């Protein structure tokens, strides 16, 4: 039986093949991305630099002598590599379990291609089992929570966590996310919301799944 970490590593190592040399790339956050950074560092593949979405990813990139640059220093990114908490057959995702989804959306939007890497347990027919992270301004937390409650969700403050931008995270359980694009937009319209963890406008272009049979490359709506 292959462990979850081994499945993540399988996907991460396959993703290195999708990284073009002599280009700037974007790097996400999370345990699967840690395996990807390790694989990229050991591959010998040369890139100009990487824009990191978190301090932890940046530190790991530096360990492998991969140049870390800011998004303001580059005109665009060839590819963005990141994991997901859930990903559906249209390659729309829920992300932000690590609280970095605002930065992740910014970097993803600057990239020509989004490669999602995950173990096979993250591939679902319908989003919503994983709680949806919503980054909120602290002073609007109660207001936003009431609005989310009215939308059918069960909001819960992520205790003791502050985002990179000094905001709070409300994790929303039980939302009906049959229409991810609509839900993403509706939540972002709530005053006091900075960003939510539905990636429908910035869906992945390619999904690389780590499975018992090896790495599986999936494109939108292939099933």
From Swiss-Prot:
Instruction: Give the Enzyme Commission number.
Output: 5.3.1.6
Record GO terms (molecular function): ribose-5-phosphate isomerase activity
Q: Which residues does the entry assign to the active site, renumbered to this chain?
A: 104 (proton acceptor)
**Source domain of life:** Bacteria
Keyword field = Isomerase
The task this protein performs is described as: Catalyzes the reversible conversion of ribose-5-phosphate to ribulose 5-phosphate.
Q: Which family does it belong to?
A: Belongs to the ribose 5-phosphate isomerase family.
Q: How does it assemble?
A: Homodimer.
The protein here is known as Ribose-5-phosphate isomerase A
